[in-house]
C-alpha cells in the first residue's frame, strides 16, 4: 500500500504522524495481549511513520517546500 503524503501540509503531516503512532501503539498492545487480524499492518504503519518523519525533517532542513 503506497501512501501519498506529498500533498500534505506540515501541520497535516504532524497530525497524521501522531494518529499513526497511536494506531501503532494500539496494535502493539493487541499483539502482546491477544490476536491481531493483520500482523503486516504494524509494519505498514511503522514505515508510514518513517516516511512522515523523513518528510518533516526535509522540511526543517529546507530540502522540501510544503
Swiss-Prot record:
Record's GO cellular component terms: ribonucleoprotein complex; ribosome
Keywords: Ribonucleoprotein, Ribosomal protein
Membership in a protein family: Belongs to the universal ribosomal protein uL29 family.
GO MF term list: structural constituent of ribosome
Gene3D superfamilies in the record: 1.10.287.310
GO BP: any one term: translation
Domain of life, per lineage: Bacteria
Family matches, as InterPro entries: Ribosomal_uL29, Ribosomal_uL29_sf
Pfam families (alphabetical): Ribosomal_L29
Protein name: Large ribosomal subunit protein uL29
Amino acid at each position: 500500500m503506497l501512501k501519498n503524503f506529498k500533498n500534505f501540509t506540515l501541520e497535516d503531516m504532524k497530525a497524521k504522524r501522531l494518529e499513526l503512532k497511536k494506531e501503532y501503539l494500539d496494535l502493539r498492545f493487541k499483539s502482546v495481549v491477544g490476536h491481531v487480524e493483520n500482523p503486516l499492518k504494524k509494519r505498514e504503519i511503522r514505515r508510514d511513520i518513517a516516511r512522515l518523519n523523513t518528510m518533516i525533517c526535509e522540511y526543517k532542513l529546507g530540502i522540501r517546500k510544503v
